[in-house]
């Protein structure tokens, strides 16, 4: 009887921890979506002006964004109070840079990609939490494949192959789907291994990881669905 009570309390604690992480992910995605909306509609003329006349603003934002990822991750793993604000600043800036990608696609394509991303994210999250299979090996394989995708993407910048871009996008969907599942399993295992003694910084770190999984999944699906846009 006591064992059942302990299990129930642990299960409730794990659910609360997942809820905390997913609220942060939702906050980040929502903030990115809001900033993208502002750039795509109220400030659309500014967006077009930057694309045509001042592209260095976009590239500068992309570089700052890349730096912020490492800063936010480092702050989160050190459990510093600045981790959450940095994560939110990154999410807002990412919304800005995303708008320059989204503007090239039809509105229906964007909604289709977003809803599909949400469905895949939800399904893979459940798989990651429920599966008994150790996914740490898969996680390593996904990161190795991700490096290959980055290299292939850089090469394709010079080649400009539409087919290669499509293949890269399909592989990216598989990679980030796998990472969503493995990240969720890791959250569960770390929580259980530490008996729930995990800091808020670690929650931010995992929220950042899941946020990146979702955004990259969305971009990959957007490119697949928008091939004819």
Curated annotation (Swiss-Prot):
Return any one Pfam family short name. Answer: Bax1-I
CDD domains the UniProt entry points to: BI-1-like_bacterial
Give the chief site where it resides: membrane
**Membrane topology per record:** Multi-pass membrane protein
Note whether Membrane occurs among the keywords: yes
Q: Which UniProt keywords apply?
A: Cell membrane, Membrane, Transmembrane, Transmembrane helix
Q: Give the UniProt subcellular location, in the record's own words.
A: Cell membrane
InterPro entries membership? Bax_inhibitor_1-related
Where are the bilayer-spanning segments?
Answer: 21-41, 56-76, 83-103, 109-129, 141-161, 162-182, 202-222
**According to its record, what are the GO cellular component terms?**
plasma membrane
Stated family:
Belongs to the BI1 family.
In its UniProt entry, what is this protein called?
Uncharacterized membrane protein SpyM3_0260
Q: Which organism is it from?
A: Streptococcus pyogenes serotype M3 (strain ATCC BAA-595 / MGAS315)
């Amino acid at each position: 009887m006591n064992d059942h009570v302990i299990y129930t309390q642990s299960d409730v604690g794990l659910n609360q921890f997942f809820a905390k992480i997913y609220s942060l992910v939702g906050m980040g995605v929502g903030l990115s979506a809001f900033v993208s909306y502002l750039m795509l509609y109220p400030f659309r003329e500014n967006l077009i002006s930057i694309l045509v006349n001042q592209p260095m603003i976009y590239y500068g934002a992309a570089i700052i964004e890349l730096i912020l990822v490492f800063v936010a991750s480092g702050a989160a793993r050190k459990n510093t109070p600045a981790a959450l604000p940095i994560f939110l600043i990154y999410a807002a800036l990412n919304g800005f840079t995303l708008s320059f990608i989204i503007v090239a696609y039809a509105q229906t394509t964007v909604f289709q990609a977003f809803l599909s991303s949400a469905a895949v994210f939800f399904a893979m999250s459940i798989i990651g939490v429920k599966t008994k299979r150790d996914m740490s090996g898969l996680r390593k394989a996904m990161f190795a494949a991700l490096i290959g995708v980055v290299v292939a993407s850089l090469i394709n910048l010079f080649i400009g192959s539409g087919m290669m871009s499509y293949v890269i996008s399909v592989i990216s969907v598989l990679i980030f789907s796998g990472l969503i599942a493995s990240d969720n399993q890791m959250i569960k295992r770390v929580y259980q291994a530490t008996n729930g003694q995990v800091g808020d910084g670690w929650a931010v770190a995992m929220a950042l990881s899941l946020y990146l999984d979702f955004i990259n999944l969305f971009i990959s699906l957007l490119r697949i669905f928008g091939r004819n846009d």
